[in-house]
């Protein structure tokens, strides 16, 4: 039995047939498989290039939209598709030195940079939202401090905390860590930690040994 579904998002018609999605807008077309392959080629974190849209597909699109300064929807518009076809791999702010992690607060992305200075992985994150919150019997501000740090210690598993569960956290500034979370909106929303999607938390945990540099900055 075959099923063909169609719905409209703005000026984009999305056809879904056997988990293969074609995005069509003003003559621009790109299947889910093509989208995943192109994003993966540019370094955006795709768990598996298989033509099946999942959370990594959506988050990779959002990361691409963040990097390119576009509307963060998780769905490719016609102009997004056009840009994706010609885009280049993002460039690290700190291209020299050993392998490291960069957290770009302005664009809400994490870049994993290899020993050669080339960005190997880009994943969407959510950092401190600068709002006040009450914890440990005091008011605090949800701020992710900018600066150059190193991974200090790690917790191999899910760490229970008063503000929520931290999945495979790598602490780099006191109680601030890069950790997995089921909630990664396309904007800053954390209490100060760097949230990453659950599909990337275990891999990042292994990729970030104690002592690895973590550079947190606002992009100029």
Predicted feature residues:
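Short acidic, glycine/serine/threonine-rich helix-capping segments at coil-helix boundaries
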Residues: 28-34, 40-84
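A structural motif detector for short, solvent-exposed N-terminal "entry" segments of globular domains
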Residues: 88-131
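Extracytoplasmic/secreted envelope proteins and their assembly/folding machinery
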Residues: 32, 36, 58, 62, ...
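N-terminal signal peptide c-region/cleavage motif recognized by signal peptidases
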Residues: 22-24
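Bacterial N-terminal signal peptides that target proteins for export
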Residues: 2-13
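Second-shell loop/turn segments in exported
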Residues: 45-51, 69-72, 96-99, 137, ...
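Sec-exported extracytoplasmic/periplasmic mature domains
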Residues: 40-44, 62-70, 85-89, 115-118, ...
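Exported/periplasmic cell-wall-interacting domains
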Residues: 29, 94, 142-146, 153-220
